[in-house]
Design a protein with these regions (language model features):
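Residue-level recognition of single "structural anchor" positions
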Residues: 1-179
Length: 179
């Protein structure tokens, strides 16, 4: 590994840290886009591996929700989830979050993730989606009815995870998605 390659990779890492796109980084540094794109993918993979190694079961007050990622389809009416990526998330109000791409939002799929990633006895907040019906076996289940109010007098809400979805979608939009 040469000193020049190390210097180049550190410059690419700096642009990655600044959240500058791979295309713009390649142009700014006068480096082939393919090289920059591969490095960005390596950085993302390393971050994901690090996060997985640090993972622990979430506990305490947990907000659960699912979200659909993917661009709007021209000609399709409504919000349809067809051809979109489903992401399930668990937000621990103390600060950690777990997300995973899932094939569907069935009870079997979501409850498996909940069982594997949360400690029994936690307090769960959901939007009342039918797949969460058996959540009581893992802890206290509070259902949030957005039709009534966003936050009730007992601070029951899922605003944290919904804010995270908004943040994530804004980030992915900036990069036109992430491979």
């Amino acid at each position: 590994y040469s000193l020049n390659k190390l210097r180049r990779d550190l410059e690419i890492l700096y642009y990655f840290y600044l959240e500058i796109s791979a295309r713009k980084t390649a142009k700014e540094l006068n480096i082939d886009y393919g090289v920059v794109h591969r490095k960005f993918m390596q950085f993302r993979k390393l971050i994901a591996e690090y996060c997985n190694k640090q993972a622990r079961k979430l506990n305490g007050e947990l907000e659960l929700d699912e979200s659909y990622f993917g661009g709007r389809r021209k000609g399709n009416r409504g919000r349809g989830a067809k051809n979109k990526t489903i992401v399930f998330g668990i937000l621990e109000r103390k600060g950690q979050i777990y997300t995973k791409i899932v094939e569907n939002v069935s009870a079997e799929t979501l409850m498996k993730e909940i069982e594997n990633k949360t400690k029994k006895g936690s307090v769960f907040y959901t939007d009342g989606w039918k797949s969460y019906a058996s959540l009581e076996q893992y802890g206290k289940h509070n259902i949030i009815d957005h039709d009534k109010e966003l936050v009730d007098k007992n601070h029951n809400h899922i605003n944290g995870i919904e804010g995270f979805w908004s943040f994530a979608k804004e980030r992915f939009h900036k990069y036109h998605g992430i491979d």
